[in-house]
């Protein structure tokens, strides 16, 4: 199997996706999706460039200059993406080996720092030919050594370094440089989703020189990247400014002079900022401002995007009452998801979902979910069973003084957190004290286990059970901050990855979801939609037919002023 740029009979660029059959959020990539995209006229302009491993806007005749103003919560705990720094803020300065294609709405995977790749027939070896002429922002020439150093740090981080994506790369046996411009990944077992992992904006390539100089720890270092934009200014909790990289390896890009990432934590303020012209776009805004923008089609674009992020209250299973699975199961049963979703509906659209989100063919249908204990609207029997479990665990009279960590995002601290707090008190007499923490610093509390319960928005690279499970649910997983351990689930995840047919995977996935319901690591509120809005003057990002929500790079953007 291969992806290789080669001349076509007509002399143009032709990309071959031979047998790759990569799937992303239920959308076929490769030849099948390229054929379907031929019906989308605006995309045709950019297809040849994308196939050659270059990103181009879907509209012809892009204009140069100007600044793109993006509003969202742009804070980050530190500057190291591998250790959990904010990819949505930092990714613009970096590249990965591959990426999702901006010109077709993120439906296909195309080269980034690679120029071509080959996949062995047994799907155990992925060999990447690297792009020549690439330099980091400090002038250091990019090579295979940088790729090996970056991914080795993800897969087997040195002592004292936290790799948040270590778990999802657990199938990688080794990564090696075959020569200065060729890298090979060898897997322990085939993983159909491996290219999707590499395309995640967080899995970027750092300079080996900078990693070595800082002993692998870049938390306090604004490390030079290879990306289309380079660092200019950062005012914490206010804004980032990144300016055009004049030496970017793709000389056509970027069109913008700079991008401004403006810290707007409140979703209503983000939407109002776009509507008033103070912002050019926001990745996720409040429902009421999105509805207003959707009505004003001459001025604004709006899209509701499927998202593999969810709202969940994570349990610290290593201490106190939440160490008892009966208490966790009681909360799973007693709290009304319907009430939580309704309380939040003016802010964000949350779906009634189980542990596999919609968009994955193995997700439980909504009508079936609505009849399950814990998920059904009628809570009478669920609360009775929950109280029985609490009594068996020794908490018939409730629990006092749980530490409930909630981010300083207004909708979390003022709506969803208090709604969950009230439900615990009313149904099970569980008292918890809400502790507000800065959103960017919340991950550090989680990594240290400094919580009893924590409201967060865990996101995943894709909707596959193996990716989700290996990142957050498997014993010892790199993002399993609550210390959850379930031998039954671990075994099912291993079975799931070894399954070779859809029927086998469906059977094991169903058993895994049942195991999570019986012994939940979280209270899962539900997976969400993101409400994207932009001014119509913003071009080049194919927002109107984007396949899913990704708060990622924007180098093909241009302003039609």
What are the residue ranges of the model-derived segments?
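Alpha-helical secondary-structure segments
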Residues: 69, 143-150, 180-186, 227-228, ...
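N-terminal secretory signal peptides
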Residues: 1-22, 33-36
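Ligand-site clamp/hinge motif
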Residues: 247-292, 329
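A structural "hinge/loop" feature
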Residues: 72-89, 113, 140, 194-203, ...
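N-terminal lobe/hinge region of extracytoplasmic solute-binding protein
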Residues: 71-121, 152, 222-226
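Detector for C-terminal structural segments
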Residues: 33-34, 43, 52, 88, ...
